[in-house]
């Protein structure tokens, strides 16, 4: 029973350690709100990320345009994650 409690504590510490950088990023985004018209269903987002997470397009070295869209990505785009803007979930599409 002690072993189970110790393993659970280690798991909780590991999860908390991973959550702190994500919370810091969310705080940075929340600190700089942008004014976007309500009638615009498309939001342009500029992000910095690890190269390993960048979209891979074979044979192309050009910059890739990424957008946060509702409800889904357009034809030819791929969903790479989720954006949270004004309390709503958006598809992060490139």
Swiss-Prot record:
Location of Phosphotyrosine modifications: 85
PROSITE patterns reported for this sequence: DEFENSIN (PS00269)
SS bond partners: 66-94, 68-83, 73-93
Entry-linked InterPro entries: Alpha-defensin, Alpha-defensin_C, Alpha-defensin_N, Beta/alpha-defensin_C
Positions of the propeptide segment: 20-64
PTM comment: ADP-ribosylation drastically reduces cytotoxic and antibacterial activities, and enhances IL8 production.
Family of this protein: Belongs to the alpha-defensin family.
Name of the protein in its database record: Neutrophil defensin 1
Species of provenance: Pan troglodytes (Chimpanzee)
